[in-house]
């Protein structure tokens, strides 16, 4: 019973800390990661369909690299 209460309090505390940190850092991020394929396709660093690619580099505009070519 005590352990359950301690775990619940710890989870609530960690959640509150994350929310506070996220609220404080809003708009201050300088190098934002490309998170969607729409943003990735507008980037000049991505490769078009049929171009050679590497699965490790994530450099296709479509977001998928199969058999060494962007899909």
Curated annotation (Swiss-Prot):
Residues recorded as bearing Cysteine amide in the entry: 70
**Which InterPro entries did the record assign?**
Conotoxin, Conotoxin_omega-typ_CS
Maturation-removed propeptide residues: 23-45
* Effect upon mutating residue 47 to A: Little decrease in activity
GO-annotated molecular function:
calcium channel regulator activity; ion channel inhibitor activity; toxin activity
Q: Where is this site: Binds Cav2.2/CACNA1B calcium channel?
A: 49, 55, 58, 62, 64, 66
Record flagged with keyword Transport: no
Question: Which subcellular locations apply to this protein?
Answer: Secreted
What are the boundaries of the signal sequence?
Answer: 1-22
- Cystine pairs: 46-61, 53-65, 60-70
Q: Which family does it belong to?
A: Belongs to the conotoxin O1 superfamily.
Question: What the protein does?
Answer: Omega-conotoxins act at presynaptic membranes, they bind and block voltage-gated calcium channels. This toxin blocks Cav2.2/CACNA1B calcium channels (IC(50)=0.67-208 nM). It acts by neutralizing the outer electronegativity and sterically hindering the ion access path to the entrance of the channel selectivity filter. It also shows antiproliferative effects on different glioma cell lines (M059J, U-138MG and U-251MG). In vivo, is lethal to fish. In vivo, injection into mammals induces adverse effects, such as tremor, diminution of spontaneous locomotor activity and bad coordinated locomotion.
Domain free text: The presence of a 'disulfide through disulfide knot' structurally defines this protein as a knottin.
Protein name stated in the entry: Omega-conotoxin MVIIA
Species? Conus magus
């Amino acid at each position: 019973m005590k352990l359950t209460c301690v775990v619940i309090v710890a989870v609530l505390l960690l959640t509150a800390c994350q929310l506070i940190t996220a609220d404080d850092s809003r708009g201050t991020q300088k190098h934002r990661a490309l998170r969607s394929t729409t943003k990735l396709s507008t980037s000049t660093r991505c490769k078009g369909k049929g171009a050679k690619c590497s699965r490790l580099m994530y450099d296709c505009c479509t977001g998928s690299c199969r058999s060494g070519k962007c899909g």
